[in-house]
């Protein structure tokens, strides 16, 4: 069955028919196409375009189609053709009435919005699960000291929990972005027709409410040609993957023998086909790698849309693969990341030792001098020279004796050793959001 053809004298070429078909991709939208068709039939009944009896036939047939299983994907043009073809096979000419006051243009946009809305809720749930795991880990490793880094060089002492909670903030923003995007996803375009609306008295608001949409689109041309909601989702997904990738990069580094801060479980690691000793952090590496794939999907759709005149163009058929692939990739990465973190072990002692040998208390020594009345820039220079001296002696700053300190600055007294204590440094942090020692209450 074709949904078009009366105007044509010649049969479509076989290669063109295959080229034009999207059923292998958009079959995923089948349940949404059926639900949207049910709501559309309700709208046709309300407008007295079909009778109560005809509606009941259509409803019964659509619900039967929803329960059917396919051993292989039918050879039809697209998911809309499939549903209408099966409907006609079941109830004859009554089934042909389903497309009254509707175009595939508003139909596909509706299906995609319903699909994406559903998937966004699933992704939000996964992000919330991830944040629960991160918060639990931060409680477990509260006050476990580690180096904080800038330029991948040891910078200042922080706690492992504070580092984990940095990612909680990122994922909270991601959740907020997804929730906000639902305002633009959850808009019904049914009734926009091909591009100009319809002369049938369809109650668009009523049909939208049946499908759980919050509002209807206000311009029929925009309704069928808009794919901003997909581009926006792909942008948000790219940000989420960026956050996962940054964390994955750290886990790859931390799990190396050079760092040895963490060890991934056997469940989330793989081995080498040639080197028997290897334990590779492939879970983190694959997440890092798949980030580029999601970025590519965003760029793909942006490129597809950038030159399209209004309204619908067949180019827009290419929106589904980047959308579906991004949804699948993002969900599996989140699931694997959650499992990886849950089973990861942390080498607290190794982190603590890394703080000791890195002069991470140098900034606090400079602040100590400022409190003694020395301008910060001068204090910075004095401490820099002290660090250089300690490096030549191959000792931490806090192991210098007081006379050595006074060789660089007479303002340094015995209380400097309290200031240089890492735990005291963490306790001294006062600003909101600082990496500080958490006292037990």
UniProtKB/Swiss-Prot annotation:
InterPro entries: Arg_succ_lyase_C, Argininosuccinate_lyase, Fumarase/histidase_N, Fumarate_lyase_CS, Fumarate_lyase_fam, Fumarate_lyase_N, L-Aspartase-like. The keyword RNA-binding does not apply. GO terms for biological process: arginine biosynthetic process via ornithine; L-arginine biosynthetic process. This is Argininosuccinate lyase. Keywords: Amino-acid biosynthesis, Arginine biosynthesis, Cytoplasm, Lyase. Pfam families: ASL_C2 (PF14698), Lyase_1 (PF00206). The keyword Lyase applies. PROSITE patterns: FUMARATE_LYASES. SUPFAM superfamilies: L-aspartase-like. Pathway: Amino-acid biosynthesis; L-arginine biosynthesis; L-arginine from L-ornithine and carbamoyl phosphate: step 3/3. CDD domains: Argininosuccinate_lyase. Its main location: cytoplasm. It catalyses: 2-(N(omega)-L-arginino)succinate = fumarate + L-arginine. GO terms for molecular function: argininosuccinate lyase activity. NCBIfam families: argH (TIGR00838). Belongs to the lyase 1 family. Argininosuccinate lyase subfamily. It comes from Petrotoga mobilis (strain DSM 10674 / SJ95). It is found in: Cytoplasm.
């Amino acid at each position: 069955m074709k949904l078009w053809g009366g105007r044509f004298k010649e049969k479509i070429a076989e290669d063109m028919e295959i080229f034009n078909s999207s059923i292998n991709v958009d079959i995923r939208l089948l349940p949404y196409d059926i639900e949207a068709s049910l709501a559309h039939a309700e709208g046709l009944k309300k407008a007295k375009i079909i009778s109560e009896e005809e509606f009941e036939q259509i409803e019964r047939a659509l619900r039967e189609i929803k329960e059917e299983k396919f051993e292989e994907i039918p050879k039809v043009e697209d998911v809309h053709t499939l549903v209408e073809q099966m409907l006609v096979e079941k109830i004859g000419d009554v089934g042909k009435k389903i497309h009254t006051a509707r175009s595939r243009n508003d139909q596909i946009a509706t299906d995609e919005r319903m699909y994406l809305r559903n998937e966004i809720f699933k992704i939000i749930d996964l992000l919330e699960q991830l944040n629960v795991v991160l918060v639990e880990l931060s409680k477990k490793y509260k006050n476990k000291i580690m180096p904080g880094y800038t330029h991948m060089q040891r910078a200042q002492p922080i706690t492992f929990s504070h580092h984990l909670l940095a990612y909680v903030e990122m994922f909270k923003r991601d959740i907020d972005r997804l929730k906000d995007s639902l305002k633009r996803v959850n808009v019904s375009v049914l009734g926009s027709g091909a591009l100009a609306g319809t002369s049938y008295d369809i109650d668009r608001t009523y049909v939208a409410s049946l499908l759980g949409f919050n509002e209807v689109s206000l311009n029929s041309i925009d309704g069928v040609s808009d794919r901003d909601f997909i581009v926006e989702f792909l942008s948000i997904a790219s940000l989420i993957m960026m956050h996962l990738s940054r964390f994955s990069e750290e886990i790859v580094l931390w799990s190396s023998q050079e760092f040895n801060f963490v060890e991934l479980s056997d469940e989330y690691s793989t081995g080498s086909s040639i080197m028997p000793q290897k334990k590779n952090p492939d879970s983190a590496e694959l997440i890092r790698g798949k980030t580029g794939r999601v970025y590519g999907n965003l760029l793909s759709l942006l490129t597809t849309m950038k030159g399209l005149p209004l309204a619908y163009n067949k180019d827009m058929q290419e929106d589904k693969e980047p959308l579906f692939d991004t949804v699948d990739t993002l969900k599996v990465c989140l699931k694997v990341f959650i499992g990886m973190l849950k089973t990861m072990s942390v080498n607290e002692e190794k982190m603590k030792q890394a703080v000791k040998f890195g002069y991470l208390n140098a900034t606090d020594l400079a602040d100590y001098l400022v409190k003694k009345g020395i301008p910060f820039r001068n204090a910075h220079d004095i401490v820099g020279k002290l660090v250089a001296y300690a490096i030549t002696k191959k000792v931490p700053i806090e192991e210098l004796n007081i006379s050595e300190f006074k060789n660089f600055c007479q303002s340094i007294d015995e209380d400097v050793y309290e200031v240089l204590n890492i735990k005291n440094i963490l306790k001294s942090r006062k600003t909101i959001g600082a990496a500080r020692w958490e006292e037990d209450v």
